[in-house]
């Protein structure tokens, strides 16, 4: 199998330039010999008019992604190549550098003392033009192609038959023969090692591009059901399949070189790192943040006095904790009361801040929108009328409470309070305790039967409360003695009152059951009056408590309204029974009235103790 190659298509400027760049990088790669004083450049490149003969001898494997074959190449054309460089003409300089490489190969040259001869260190460079022409190639090679591993080319024999080398030193026969031998050896190495390596790397570059295009196509086809229609998918695939597209999808060598330059510039410990456009480097991040527009910089632009004042404060150490790069302003400008640091344009400063914030708000929002930026407003030295009214009401209440106190005592830490009291506890520190018992008050009520007759009404007593009156000192023994006497008097009076009530059975029943007389007992109401008015015993519910403690009424609560109703009834019954005292004194249904002091001896003692002829005593709160 054989085929013809259109050799005239190679005579294009892009291909010629690309080949020059490729050969230049290949010739200058690695360490250059000491005889060369400069790099090698391509001066002239011409592929000629005669095409080589290319013949495939055998195909060992053929598939869509794999190929293996043996080919034969024969070329006897007019290809020529001209190289330009500079060579070192000073033999002492060449010998000096060669000896350094032999003696000091793995060490630094600065560690050894070398003779500093002026003649040997001087360079004498001579330009050299080297032309390669009349190339004859005849060889058999093996080609192995794979999409994953690229293209591999290996020659079985030495393909170079002959080559003509001409240079500027052709007049010197010794140099001409030397150059001829050296260049032939280098070209043989080129066909044996360099050319297969270059072809393999070039194939990997373009194969990776094809693989990337295939991956993009597959991803676009997978997104068809998600975010793209059929028309959009067809247009996107056409972008990659169209060979005549003005913007082909290829890797730009300039971008790759820029990225490589950026990468290599960071592999150094130098302090002077090169700058790049549109790139923020971490070493210069502080300068970038200072120049970035923020609130403080905007205020500096509008107020030159502010900038001068704040910079001076920083330089003199007045504002060491302030960070000029942060998006904020020094708090000393707003709250400082020092004459040296006080800023007298605070109102103007706040207006500038408000305008800057408003401009930023309208910059990133729709200007036609009616919404305005919401601001937080704080009114200083202004109190609401409701709070002032509450304060006046509380002050008046405190004054009224002070006027109603009957007794105040000061207790020291060593003093103790009788444990029989249920409303006052001992204090671990010095405090003032105010004892105030509100006795039952009398209210006159006009009745239809008698306008002059006045009725007494029982009011709910007020318990003791802790208060802070004027300091008065009372001894411990006096307090305990007075509390004990008051407690005995109140207990005797209360028991006498219960015995004289209309339901003595309740009292006897509570005593017989072992219950005590006091607030919260389950023996029933104190005065024998229930809500239904029948005088029966109140039963305690065994069901669990359904309400919280805050929803319950206190167990010390006494319904005084019902007591007043019974007292009025007693007065009416007492008035009727006063006319028939001798007849009804021995009857079974006789109910003693509170106005009859002669019916029971204990009753007179009860009323005289409270100085009220018809008022019931309070419970024992002491």
UniProtKB/Swiss-Prot annotation:
Q: Which residues form a coiled coil?
A: none
Extent of Polar residues compositional bias = 577-587
- GO molecular function per UniProt: lipid binding
Q: What are the Low complexity biased-composition ranges?
A: 446-455
* Gene Ontology CC, one term: ERMES complex
Q: What does the UniProt keyword field contain? A: Lipid transport, Lipid-binding, Membrane, Mitochondrion, Mitochondrion outer membrane, Transmembrane, Transmembrane beta strand, Transport
Q: Where are the transmembrane segments?
A: none
**Source species, domain of life:** Eukaryota
Q: Where is the SMP-LTD domain?
A: 1-204
Question: Is Transport there in the keyword field?
Answer: yes
Membrane topology for this entry?
Multi-pass membrane protein
Localization: Mitochondrion outer membrane
Query: Where in this protein does the record put region Disordered?
Result: 364-393, 442-468, 572-592
Entry keyword annotation includes Transport: yes
Q: Name one GO biological process term.
A: mitochondrion-endoplasmic reticulum membrane tethering
Where does the record place Basic residues bias? 372-385
Comment, domains: Lacks alpha-helical transmembrane segments, suggesting that it resides in the membrane via beta-sheet conformations similar to those predicted for other outer membrane proteins and porin.
What is this protein's function per UniProt? Component of the ERMES/MDM complex, which serves as a molecular tether to connect the endoplasmic reticulum (ER) and mitochondria. Components of this complex are involved in the control of mitochondrial shape and protein biogenesis, and function in nonvesicular lipid trafficking between the ER and mitochondria. MDM34 is required for the interaction of the ER-resident membrane protein MMM1 and the outer mitochondrial membrane-resident beta-barrel protein MDM10.
Q: How does it assemble?
A: Component of the ER-mitochondria encounter structure (ERMES) or MDM complex, composed of MMM1, MDM10, MDM12 and MDM34.
Q: Which family does it belong to?
A: Belongs to the MDM34 family.
Instruction: Return the protein name.
Output: Mitochondrial distribution and morphology protein 34
UniProt organism field: Candida albicans (strain WO-1) (Yeast)
Tell me the classification of the organism that encodes this protein: Eukaryota, Fungi, Dikarya, Ascomycota, Saccharomycotina
* Gene that this polypeptide is encoded by: MDM34
